[in-house]
């Protein structure tokens, strides 16, 4: 059945037709009786229909009407089911009967019979009619679609493009309007009230978005840097290097790059502007904010690039936020950074290793690129040192928007600053009025998660006796969607507590903070050249850092800072400025990069602070052991290959050995997986590592083999989210692992390792024990300095200069579980990935070395003499 509805004035007239298929070439429309009034209308309509001969087929007849408006009404609805008469739109009277006619395509009949219209049945009748309308609507849509499909199939032929007509010369060829395809808008199926609701929701969404954009633009104008826009641009044009000093929240990071784009520094998209950040979280979050302000898609005009992740578009991105290490690596492919018109080194006061090396390299290329602009952004008072390094270049000061902050010290030192911080949180929460959020500085992910758990336990016990509290963590390995929660507005009658690392000192601006709790500690890497080991230490902050932390409380109004240390400690125990990373870290990766760029005299390379001679000497020694340098200190072919990988030289050596060494060939795929997993282990597990390990493998002897098995099982599940949930693994972390692995695989393919590995793999098969032995040998070749030996009192480090340091296996390691809880015999030799000092020296991510001769086979220049000497001493 098909119904056609037209309007005459305000009265709706329903016309219904029954379509009967006579043959493949003709369609006849006959009126269907729907009562006297409808039958009369249908007959009138049918009498107006005429048969029209098709120009394409003289035997084919189409139904047509000469009534203009009604012709269009007839098109798409002739094959539908019966529509309801307009009388059903009015109040239902007694003895009405609703019948759904059987359609052309043989669908089952949908009949609804109604009882007499006594007043007590009016509600029931109304409900049934409503259901019948819905059923009829579905039937009409289904019948129409099936009929269109049959029509299309009926017109098919073996050669649909070959049209042969008898007597074709007798016809004029024009586009026949009867052959047009009828379409319906998806909104046509909406009831009037539904359409009104849809349009209202759409209008509201558009209005909300317009208000949001206007709010963003208004907020931009309120930032302190906005009033200095013209003056700042003039100074940039006048000077090749400019130091910009401004407090966190002044807008220099987000607004200045936009000013440069608006002023034409990108030459209509031909050039880019690079803004470096010391941390991944800052690069990604700031890029997202700027893209939002510019009303563009993140990854197009505005993008970011961090290690193992590139969210930019070639020939499209003009603003690129990136970690300083990523810009440093671009020197390998473009030593003059020719695609950039301006480079902004943001948060330069943090003095990361990559930032210091970048500044030295940029100082060298500035004379070669006179049009390149260099902006050094700093939030502290050490801007003068940067100015002196660049021949006393000018300093532009952007005043911050800062309210007074009251500083509170403890009367005596606190033995447990975590416990003291939790106590202070509830002290503020229960005594201070709303609004006013709390920012707590902690040293790392473990402290943050432990504090978060404790706060949630206490809040659950307090229940409704205190105001609601929202706890939001922020640290580097937190998934990005969870990181963004710290920027969400705090609901009314609620307080937000942000648990953060030192990333919140300057890199991020969090609105709504009125209270800061500062234990005064930070976690730093400390490299000891004499032992050749890097330790992760928790150390006191500098005075500059704690002052920056206090300033976070004065962004939206007068605030308070609670320091969990005494004023005497602040004045006498804290260093004035933090130590530059270049003076306290392993420089092997940096030295290799500089040598690959052609820097031969490391002593004379321009640096703001010089590393110690022992540190440089130890780095050169490590590179020589890895085979990256020859005996003359010149970079080797292997060393140049290592530079192609976005990871430490030690990991690059592992991958190289896995594909080329005759005793290890064929395990590149496994080593790629393990290396990728080791980059993300801090955020890999939900809860305890041992629980996840037990669900993956019943028995495993090493952390490295556990990581390999986790990835393999996840891959076998087709990278399933549910598999991760079942095995207590972070799904987002595994996605990052997969991205890292893909990038490392592409690098391996580029330097020819994949082809060599495939050839060797065919010879060794897939025996697990054989594969694991080769994996262990590969890691020995890459980390010969990270091997400990079991002694009378436990494990001790090896090496002539670094031997004898007592270390313990960290409780999170599988080795600890095997030795302490399963009483398995400890292995004589163990390789570790990280040495950290907390209550004592711990080693993490451990790999068992079952055979002593593997050490001699893989690194004879170190272990042959060491093992022989110990053997001889034992015999004496």
UniProtKB/Swiss-Prot annotation:
Ranges for the Helicase C-terminal domain? 424-598
A Gene Ontology molecular-function term?
Answer: helicase activity
Q: Where is the composition biased (Polar residues)?
A: 61-70
One GO biological process term is: snoRNA splicing
Q: Do you know which PROSITE patterns this protein is assigned to?
A: DEAH_ATP_HELICASE (PS00690), HELICASE_ATP_BIND_1 (PS51192), HELICASE_CTER (PS51194)
- Cite the Helicase ATP-binding domain residue spans from the record: 233-399
Q: So what family is this one in?
A: Belongs to the DEAD box helicase family. DEAH subfamily.
Kindly give any further remark recorded in the entry.
Answer: Present with 172 molecules/cell in log phase SD medium.
Give the protein's recorded name.
Pre-mRNA-splicing factor ATP-dependent RNA helicase-like protein PRP2
